[in-house]
Every structure is written in structure tokens, then in C-alpha cells.
Amino acid sequence: GSNERVCGVSEHRFSLTVSPEPIDPTQSVSPRKQARRHVVSAEHKPPLRGSAAATFHGEVERWNPEELFLASLAQCHLLSLLYVLERDGVGEVECTIDAEAILVVEPSGAGRITAVSLTPTTRTDADAATVFAAHQEAEKLCFIANSVSCEVTVTPQVLSASASDTQG
């Protein structure tokens, strides 16, 4: 995205386009599901195939807004964590984040994601206290988490990079 700096504060802009896909009457997918098909596109990136969540008459093979919201939170935490660890001189780190969101839908059809749970598993030879502190700082730094109204809970696990694959 583009950016500008005013009084030490930087502002960055990001843009993309969401476009419908035309309905194809020769396909076995129902027109109702096809009507929810769309493509997310942005300069220099491959297109992302989207739909509604399957529970809302979408297609399970396509990304839905709820998953993309969840992915943006998990990805932002990961990148914030890597920033903190790199800044603090922590060497090689491997982090996988499992994420879950709770969507509550009212009888009126209005809904909101009320909670997000991120469970990062970090494999490194750095000491666990350093990694836990880095996760806490990453929570505070994450641009996306700072922009949402639902609760975002992070429950990190730290594994030794030289240990076997047993979870601790």
C-alpha cells in the first residue's frame, strides 16, 4: 500500500477489488451458490476465489469472509511476533497458528464475530520466557487485532527446536 508520514505517524493505504463471477448455467452448482461466488483481486497478487460460508449457501472450496477475517488476525499476529523476535535477536523460529472464531447470528440475520482464539505453537531454541514475552508484545502490536471490537485471545505454546515433535 501507499504511505505518507505526518508528525512521525505513518499512514498506509491498501486497496483491492471484489468482483462477482458470472453464473454459468452449465455447472452442477446451484445458481444460488454461484451467485455468491466472487474474486478478490489486487495488484501483483493471484486472485482469491471467494464465496459465502457453506452454512450461508456458499461453497466450502472457496474462502469466505469469516475465514479471511480469522486469517488476517492469525497472519498479523505471526508477522508481529516475527518482527519482535527478529528485533530482539532471536534466531531461527518456526511458528504455526491454529485459529478459531465464534460468529453469533441474531434472529434478524445480523451477526458479529464475538471472539477469536489464536493458538500459536512456536518452535525455537530461544528460552520460553523470551518467546512468551514476544507473543504478548505481538498481541499489542498487531494492526488487525487493534482494529477489531471482538476479544482476541492468544494462548502460545513453545517447543524446543531441537526436541522431538511432542507438544508441551
Residue ranges and their predicted role:
Residues 3-71, 79-168:
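Extended beta-strand/beta-hairpin segments
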